[in-house]
Curated annotation (Swiss-Prot):
Keyword line: Cleavage on pair of basic residues, Disulfide bond, Knottin, Secreted, Signal, Toxin
GO molecular function: ion channel inhibitor activity; toxin activity
Biased composition (Basic and acidic residues): 21-37
Top-level taxon: Eukaryota
Tissue: Expressed by the venom duct.
Free-text comment about domains: The presence of a 'disulfide through disulfide knot' structurally defines this protein as a knottin.
Protein name per Swiss-Prot or TrEMBL: Conotoxin AbVIL
Secretion signal, residue range per the UniProt entry: 1-17
A single GO cellular-component term on record: extracellular region
Chief site of localization: secreted
Length: 74
């Protein structure tokens, strides 16, 4: 009886795998690339206005001038 149960469960798994590989899956999971593209933050280039919460491309905002630093800042 145990051998028959194992064979039955194996056959069920193979049938399910074959069905999903043919594209007959009804509810597909969202692609991870879609999620990653929505989560990507844009940075503010050097010389543009910024504050303490701005994501400057070169990592720092000069709070004295309220502008993102450029790549060749002193």
């Amino acid at each position: 009886v145990l051998i028959i149960a194992v064979l039955f469960l194996t056959a069920c798994q193979l049938t399910t795998a074959e069905t999903s590989s043919r594209g007959e899956q009804k509810h597909r999971a969202p692609r991870s690339t879609d999620k990653n593209s929505r989560m990507t933050k844009r940075c503010t280039p050097g010389g543009e206005a910024c504050d303490a919460t701005t994501n400057c491309c070169f990592l720092t905002c000069n709070l004295a001038t309220n502008k993102c630093r450029s790549p060749n800042f002193p």
